[in-house]
């Protein structure tokens, strides 16, 4: 195994390199139950409602292809513990019908493994980011939406300032 699971400064627990990991290495498979898109949507909504009610209900659903997703909310899926970063050192890739977490760069022993969760803007306020990256915008949103988010936040701050 190339990794250890331990406490993370980003969020709860995380995955850390046990040894130096070369660029483009298959680090860990993201495993879980293969489910239809309809079931995926149902579970996603259910878990988001749980999260709003009691702070739990994390969603670990990954898109596999146009017909199926993987629900990684199973105890044996250690990849679900990989935290988000706005400057990730890994990314998920579908390879031969499996989801793999692949290193984007050389990762040194002890470094936390991260990837960009790629959330849309729709519910950004529900997903604050604590990655600490210089590129961090304060919320977990996909890279191509960060410019728009910065504009939204700037407009919001202006409105708040006028209220005072």
Question: For each of these PLM feature ranges, what is it?
Answer:
Residues 85-164:
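C-terminal SET catalytic tail plus cysteine-rich post-SET Zn-binding segment of SAM-dependent SET-domain
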Residues 1-92:
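Catalytic cores of histone-lysine modification enzymes
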């Amino acid at each position: 195994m190339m990794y250890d699971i331990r406490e993370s400064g980003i969020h709860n627990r995380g995955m850390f390199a046990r040894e130096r990991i070369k660029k483009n290495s298959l680090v860990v498979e993201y495993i879980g139950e293969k489910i239809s898109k309809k079931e995926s949507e149902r579970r996603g909504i259910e878990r988001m409602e749980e999260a709003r009610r009691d702070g739990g209900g994390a969603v670990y659903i990954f898109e596999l292809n146009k017909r199926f997703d993987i629900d990684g909310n199973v105890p044996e899926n250690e990849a679900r513990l990989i935290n988000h970063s706005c400057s990730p050192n890994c990314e998920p890739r579908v390879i031969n019908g499996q989801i793999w977490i692949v290193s984007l760069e050389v990762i040194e022993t002890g470094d936390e493994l991260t990837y960009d969760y790629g959330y849309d803007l729709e519910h950004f306020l529900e997903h604050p980011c604590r990655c600490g990256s210089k590129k961090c915008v304060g919320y977990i949103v996909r890279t191509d939406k960060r410019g728009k988010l910065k504009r939204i936040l700037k407009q919001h701050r202006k409105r708040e300032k006028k209220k005072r």
